[in-house]
Amino acid sequence: GVSTRPVEKRVIDTVKWVTDNYDIDPNRVYLSGNSMGGSGALGIGLRHGDIFAAIKANVPAGIEHADQRMSFSDFKKSENLNLPDPPITLNYSGQNDGWSFGHDRFVNAMNGRKYPLYFYWGAFGHANNHERILKVNDLINSFDWLNVRKNQAYPVFTNASCNSKLPWPDNLKDKKSGQLNAFFRWRSISDTEKDFKISLFMISSDQLKTEFRIPEKATVDVSLRRLQRMNFNEGDSVKWSFGKVNGETIIGSDNIFTVKNLNLTSTPQTLSINK
């Protein structure tokens, strides 16, 4: 269900206590787990973007924990959730791993709710050994998730043209490796009440050596979360520009700024917002 359970409360209270008592930067707290721990990282971590800057699930043993805690399969219940912006989420799973069942629902929910996701897969089964998995999908460590800070805004990339086709639920025998959002990067520039700027770009083949073909350009929808000072309300009219392109976005009921069909390349361009 969606109500907080005693075990989750103990985990969060313990993390808070350690952070407070051991001089830990509260903006650089991360959560990761393998197998059952990966399921827990998703189920506990996604709800607590106020605690965790980013989370990483290695071959999670099921997505049901996250599904229930985030009400991914029950839109009605999800409307009543009042959660902070989620942590940036990394996940890698093997389509030939029985525990990976349901990742199509997980990916669709993350995409539909404009939650940040870097997702990698391949025919590596339930392995949690990086050396072994890298032989199947060499992208799993390509994003520096431990450099994410909780006190910095981030872009959410959805519906990208460069995403691989998911093998879930109907093509699990396909051994092809794949990725979602693996090549997108950003750099924060400014974040004030009236002005927000963020540089968006794709990593290039010169910067990342991989067996995957990195496209020269891609089209993607971009939403903004964890803005530190600028707030949006339903019905707000927000002017934006991205390189030579500009437009106006009306904020919807989710109170999230989204601009669709931006063209990204390895050349950084600045997304600017003015209120």
Stretches found by the model and what they are:
Residues 1-36, 46, 51:
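Gly/Ser-rich "nucleophile elbow"/oxyanion-hole loop immediately N-terminal to the catalytic nucleophile
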Residues 113-118, 124-274:
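Alpha/beta-hydrolase-fold serine-hydrolase catalytic core, especially in secreted/extracellular enzymes
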Residues 51, 85-87, 218, 236:
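Residues that flank catalytic or metal-binding motifs in active/ligand-binding sites
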Residues 18-25, 75-84, 229-231:
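Surface-exposed acidic, glycine-flexible loop patches that form ligand/cofactor-binding
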Residues 22, 48, 52, 59, ...:
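A generic secondary-structure signal for well-formed alpha-helical elements
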Residues 31-34, 39-85:
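Hydrolase active-site cap/lid region
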Residues 61-151:
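The feature captures the conserved acid-bearing segment of alpha/beta-hydrolase catalytic domains
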Residues 2-13, 99-115, 235-246:
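Extracellular low-complexity, Gly/Ser/Thr-rich intrinsically disordered linkers
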